[in-house]
UniProtKB/Swiss-Prot annotation:
Protein family: Belongs to the UPF0346 family.
Highest taxon listed in the record's lineage: Bacteria
Organism: Pediococcus pentosaceus (strain ATCC 25745 / CCUG 21536 / LMG 10740 / 183-1w)
Pfam entry (one): YozE_SAM_like
Protein name: UPF0346 protein PEPE_1063
Classification via InterPro entries: UPF0346 (IPR010673), YozE_SAM-like (IPR023089), YozE_SAM-like_sf (IPR036806)
Amino acid sequence: MKKSFFEYLMTQRNPQPNNEVEEFANQAFFDQVFPKQSRDFDEISKYLELNAGYLQSMSIFDSAWQRYLESEQF
């Protein structure tokens, strides 16, 4: 069964973040209304654009999404 994007993102959490994706994962963990079951790029992207003040740039999401897609190929 494929993971949702949020499930994948939680694998990137790190108490001492080394990059922007890890920081994004740490912050998303505390976002109680994040679309946790979604696998849809547009749904998550729109949510983040409107609600995620903790995300400095949407390019961070794009990078995380690309890693998510790569992880789902295996």
